[in-house]
Amino acid sequence: AFFNRGGGYVGICAGSYLAAANYSWSLGISNHKTFCETIDLPDIGRKSMWYRGPSATVKMELTKAGREILGDRNGVFQVRYQNGPIMSPMGVKGLGAFRTLAIFRSEVVRYGPQKGTLVNTPAIIAGEYGKGRVLSISPHPESSAQLYSLVANGIRWAGRR
């Protein structure tokens, strides 16, 4: 009912996992899945590939659609990352495709098999659910004063303000 009345959702980091469509516990309001494999690593044991260690800085770049919605910030810039989701299309029928608003341009790696799985993937995506809007943000732009306007613009977009 909330989305059918035009409600908006903004999920940052864990909120993007929650919006996804690939978990039994997720809301399924965004047509994305998250990279959540667990593998056995020799001499280390079974490890979750989403875990990349403590908070770190990565590089991110807005797409043309991202600059239109989040603000006209050109080029690559730094953002805090702390194990946010690696998002890709889920392909759920009846759920519209998402638009990529920002792309990761670097990555954090804790285990060898993680190399290459974050860089050049969507960092921020936007979609619609019912008559509402969904914004999923993997990193933490809200933790940097220089990026407050990006978050504020995203909230305004989701709320149709």
Label every PLM stretch briefly.
Residues A1, A21, S26-G28, K33-C36, ...:
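Extracellular ligand-binding/catalytic regions of CAZymes and related secreted enzymes
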Residues G6-G11, G15, G84, G130-G132, ...:
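Glycine-centered flexibility sites
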Residues A1-N74:
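A glycine-rich, often tryptophan-bearing local segment used as a flexible ligand/cofactor-contacting loop or short
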Residues W50-R133, S138-E142:
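Catalytic beta-strand/loop cores that center a nucleophilic Ser/Cys/Thr
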